[in-house]
């Protein structure tokens, strides 16, 4: 099984390759069922506050 911290770090690194440098905050959250959502934006937020203009991606479950 994957280590969650390593997986979240990998997601953040991948998202960073797509981020505008001004989008300083890169975040990743586990969203249940082993799925993860990562995004970059100017300020941190909870997953439910992610806005349409955030760069984001949902990864399928890995568990």
UniProtKB/Swiss-Prot annotation:
Disulfide bonds join 40-45. GO terms for biological process: proteolysis. Binds 1 zinc ion per subunit. GO terms for cellular component: extracellular region. Glycosylated. The N-terminus is blocked. It is an enzyme of class 3 (hydrolase). Negative results: does not degrade components of the extracellular matrix. Does not induce local tissue alterations, such as hemorrhage, myonecrosis, and edema, in mice. Does not induce systemic hemorrhage, thrombocytopenia nor prolongation of the bleeding time following intravenous administration. This is Snake venom metalloproteinase basparin-A.
């Amino acid at each position: 099984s994957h280590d969650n911290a390593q997986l979240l770090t990998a997601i953040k690194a991948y998202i960073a390759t797509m981020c505008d440098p001004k989008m300083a905050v890169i975040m990743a959250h586990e969203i249940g069922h082993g799925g993860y959502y990562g995004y970059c934006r100017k300020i941190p937020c909870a997953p439910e506050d992610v806005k349409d203009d955030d760069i984001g991606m949902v990864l399928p479950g890995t568990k």
